[in-house]
Regions:
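Short active-site loop/helix that positions an aromatic residue
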Residues: 55-65
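Long, compositionally biased stretches
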Residues: 1-48, 66-125
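Short aromatic/basic micro-patch
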Residues: 52
């Protein structure tokens, strides 16, 4: 599904549209131009993840109480996979009702890391 960028991904402000592809219940692929990101469903590994979005960002992304949204986090994939890191402080929010998206900095970002190791949430083999 294609989404129009309302709040750009930091460092990639020139990209105006992205295509989101579900890989499985945990991982997603986000493509725009020549750029590709691996995204992760934060609730699959951190059920207590608390997403507090500013009123200004909610307005820009047209988020209401009944909006069909998806929250995903950017992941830097490494080998082995346990060495990958996740940005929990600034998730990417997808509004499926309006096909718009944006990266936000959480109101409670101080509670989260930009580079939280995946190893903190999965068991090694």
């Amino acid at each position: 599904m294609e989404f129009k960028v309302i709040l750009p991904i930091l460092g990639f402000e020139q990209i105006e549209k992205y295509k989101l592809e579900k890989i499985d219940d945990v991982f997603f692929k986000l493509e725009g131009g020549d750029i590709s990101f691996t995204l992760i469903n934060p609730f699959s590994i951190k059920p207590d993840y608390d997403v507090i979005i500013s009123d200004a960002d909610k307005e820009k992304l047209n988020i209401k109480d009944d909006s069909n949204i998806l929250v995903l986090n950017n992941m830097i994939v490494a080998t082995p996979l346990q060495n990958s890191t996740i940005n929990f402080a600034s998730p990417i929010i997808f509004n499926f009702d309006d096909n718009i998206m944006g990266q936000v900095i959480l109101e409670n970002a101080q509670n989260y890391s930009l580079t939280d190791p995946l190893a903190n949430y999965i068991k090694g083999e």
